[in-house]
């Protein structure tokens, strides 16, 4: 036991330095008056009150709207793909899952730039439409371009946990359902879907949290017109230089994420 304790000590030191200390600093900045040094702590809730202004609440609403839309699309497309993959032979499943994860090996920034080339007014898609005699369509800097970028970047995080649940499912339950006279639809809704819910909830949690907290995709595909909560935090730290307000927003986002994760965990237990 002592040997294992010694092995874990370097990790604890690393976690304290790169996780605990930054969180403490963010908390101190969040509750400190703007312009004051952290070491001369002056308690205030003004940074949190500021976030309740209509301008910033609209950012939360926009972030949740696009996050929910992205999650729904990823679930609608990802579940059938995961189901189809789970029905393939085991070797084919490994290959298909590899193909699903390969895009994640490429830096998100590069993938987003690739979508900019595809969706721009002079991009590949509009060029193909022109060859078909169709007028160019404005796709960049719209909800469409942002959602497309979010869906394509985060789809694997929906497919993989669902596939894991489906592939580990005890097939005897499905056979028992058929033996009891259930048709394919009843078997899916009463057996397959319910047994795959843990994977679905994990996928929903990952895609939603990534969607509302990212800032690269909305910034590039939205042309700076789409201020989501991730972009707001980035702008406060990098552009505005208001670390106090940026830290307060970061804490609010962390609390929202914890609440969402708790709800997902409760739903998983209920199922």
Give the label of every model feature segment.
Residues 20-54, 119, 223, 271:
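Short membrane-interfacial helix/loop motifs at transmembrane-helix boundaries
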Residues 54-87:
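Transmembrane alpha-helix signature in integral membrane proteins
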Residues 24-26, 34, 158-161, 199-234:
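Non-cytoplasmic
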Residues 2, 35, 47-55, 215, ...:
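Interhelical loop and adjacent transmembrane-helix boundary motif
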Residues 2, 6-10, 18, 28-32, ...:
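C-terminal transmembrane helix and the adjacent membrane-cytosol boundary/short C-terminal tail
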Residues 36, 45, 112-151, 185, ...:
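Membrane-interfacial helix termini and adjacent extracytoplasmic/periplasmic loops
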Residues 13-20, 98, 102, 152, ...:
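Transmembrane alpha-helices
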